[in-house]
Amino acid sequence: MAILLGIFEEGLIYAIMALGVYITYKILDFPDLSVDGTFPLGAALTAGLIVKDISPVWALPLSFFAGVLAGCVTGFIHVKCKVRDLFSGIIVMTALYSVNLRIAGMKANLPFLSQDTIFDNEWTRNSLPASVRPYIVVIILAVIALICKFVLDWYLNTRSGYLLRAAGDNDTLVTSLAEDKGRVKIIGLAIANGFAALAGGVLAQKQAFFDISIGTGTMVFGLASVILGTQLFHRFGKLKATTAVIAGAILYKACVAFVISMRIVKATDLKLITAAILLLILIISDSMKRKGAHYA
């Protein structure tokens, strides 16, 4: 049961980030590596605020808006400075390493074990029935992930959301509608990095500490979740893509946990496992596309 809870906990946290990757990878077709910097940005800001006795609840929206700002910078560098998309993300990701250290007080590790978090506070300790307490983390994470999903679903059905989709599929259409396709891209990158930073803040509160290396491989996890979810559940026509992404994140975390539980590799090889599983998913996904094209 503990392993299952761990899978859902980690999967739901990274599902929030994967929703952002879905925007950049699937909708905008933008290889945004700044996610590896905005994820720890959210964690660093959350840790810094909680250490200063700021409410852990308020720390999350503030982390989201910090990610939005970072995403705007990535978009500005790409759109206004005419820097290629890949390089824009790398520049911001690199710069955020120093920014995150400064936010954390120049500390590579910032614990706040004695502070209240959204998962461990007076209400969760004293007001909940004993039978519910073991599941409170999963419940809270599910609520946050679902809120993010429904907000994104709502946004994608607005005029701005339709323009965002068009910017990825046919940016000429955006221009023909007298809209600035560059501005639309910046908005998409802002929202995507906002989700990444929010996920980082949630993870920091779950672990009760910030670590500067917390964002390493974030983009890989997000890509794997998006590809796995959308490829595996695309046959279910009524299933929204955002739901598939969340399911993909949980399933991907389950795959990683399964490989570790087999004791073939050590837990310290987590990043190696993550990369290997992503490679396998990409190979299978490409094979499925080729078969589909062959029978079409």
Describe every region a protein language model picked out.
Residues 3-55, 60, 77-81, 227-238:
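Single transmembrane alpha-helix segments in multi-pass membrane proteins
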Residues 10, 86-87, 108, 137-138, ...:
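Loop-to-transmembrane alpha-helix initiation sites
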Residues 21, 54-94, 99, 145-146, ...:
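Alpha-helical transmembrane segments within multi-pass membrane transporters and channels
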Residues 85, 91-92, 96-157, 187, ...:
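Transmembrane helix-bundle core of multi-pass membrane transporters
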Residues 169-183, 236, 243, 255-296:
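Cytosolic-side transmembrane-helix boundaries in multi-pass membrane proteins
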Residues 196-271:
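Transmembrane alpha-helical segments in multi-pass inner-membrane proteins
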